[in-house]
Amino acid sequence: MDLLNFLDDKITEEDTYTYSLTDVLKIRAEKEPKKTAYIFLKDGEDEEERITYGELYQSALTIAGKIRKNSKEGERALMLYPPGLEFVKALFGSFFANIIAVPVYPPRKNRSLNRIMSIVDDSEASLVLTTDYIHSSFHKNFSDIQSLKELYWIVTEGINAGPKFSGEIFNEDIALLQYTSGSTGTPKGVMVTHKNIMRGSEYIRQCFMHSRKSTSV
């Protein structure tokens, strides 16, 4: 059992039961800070932006600091983001902050808010993490919805400075709540632990024979 195994393609089953994604990001940021972690492809083809392990780690810690300034461990945060790296940074930020992420697609224009409101009620979310555009859009178009007004909104976009936070994370802790589409009824949430994510990632790595040199799309 060794965290460095994640850098040398020597990952053991025990490693995946012991460490979390935040542990892996931290060691990669320390040992390979300039290596690309994620690339966002606009329309699935053209590169729009990329982020290194070092940049992602620092962004996530700063976002976590902002989150914990306005929340407590174990609270649930609705995550309203379009596809892109802002979501990735906020997701890792929620992990480091020890809060439970609740990813939700933003509603399209003129589309009913019923699904989102159902998820807010079921998850008992108290926070919303989002971009400046979505934050402004919600408050412009849905300012009369009291339950949305009661949520604490945090715009993570552009958070580059401020206190950092890194909480203690255990593999059995809930990392996120994953909800069904709700197309055939009320959306139902599934609790996903940090261990679930690590084990699933390892299964994928083994199945596709990925190595530290692999690039996944």
Can you describe what each PLM-predicted range is?
Residues 16-39, 58, 175:
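A short N-terminal helical cap/helix-turn-helix that marks the beginning
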Residues 34, 38-71, 75-88, 92, ...:
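Conserved AMP-binding/adenylate-forming core of the ANL superfamily
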Residues 10-19, 114, 147, 151-174, ...:
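Flexible, low-complexity linker/hinge segments
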Residues 9-17, 43-50:
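Acyl-group handling in specialized metabolite and lipid biosynthesis
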Residues 92-103, 121-122:
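Short hydrophobic alpha-helices that are characteristic scaffold elements of the AMP-binding
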Residues 33-36, 153-154, 160-179, 185-186, ...:
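Conserved pre-ATP/AMP-binding loop-to-beta segment of ANL
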Residues 107-140, 162-163, 200-217:
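Conserved ATP-dependent adenylate/AMP-binding module captured primarily in the ANL superfamily
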Residues 75-80, 95, 175, 215-217:
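Short, well-ordered beta-strand segments
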